[in-house]
A protein has these predicted regions:
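Structural alpha-beta junctions
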Residues: 64-70, 101-105, 112-124
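A generic structural motif
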Residues: 93-98, 140-142
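Acidic, proline/glycine-rich low-complexity IDRs
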Residues: 113-145
């Protein structure tokens, strides 16, 4: 099974589990095999956002930090379009970082990614299968316009 098909299968399962909230998947599940530059932050692609491979590497480095519990990708409401088009990767809306770091520190990790910042919490509500931050940790959601 290709990484794309595995991701779509996971997304369909998550959607059935909690259709009222957008699915959240681990960083590697979203980026492995993904070479579609416009699958995340399409409005910043070619306007300063690094290539998708570099974006992935940057978030992998963040995920490896000792003050980070995990990094996850929040899907866009139109992710299901990829079910109808074999050439499309499911669209992502944001990146969620579970960390005990403070906001200025988190924002410093995002330098050069052309994001519009990070807010605390799940912007569209927490999916039933989304990870729960450990005690002393919180969710920062990185977003792009």
């Amino acid at each position: 099974m290709t990484p794309r098909m595995a991701l779509l299968q996971t997304l369909e399962h998550l959607d059935a589990l909690d259709p009222d909230h957008l699915p959240v998947v681990p960083l590697d599940a979203y980026f492995t095999g993904n070479d579609q530059e416009e699958s995340i932050a399409p409005n910043q692609w070619e306007f300063g956002r690094p290539p998708i491979g570099e974006l992935y590497a940057r978030f992998q480095a963040i995920a490896a930090r000792p003050d980070v519990q995990g990094v996850y990708v929040g899907l866009h409401q139109d992710w299901g379009m990829a079910l109808e088009d074999d050439t499309e990767w499911p669209a992502a809306e944001n990146i969620h970082i579970l960390t005990c770091a403070d906001e200025p520190t988190v924002l410093s990790w995002l330098d050069g990614l052309e994001s519009d910042g990070a807010s605390t919490g799940w912007p569209y509500g927490q999916h039933a299968a989304a990870p729960v931050p450990a005690e002393g940790f919180q969710v920062f959601s990185v977003f792009w316009d």
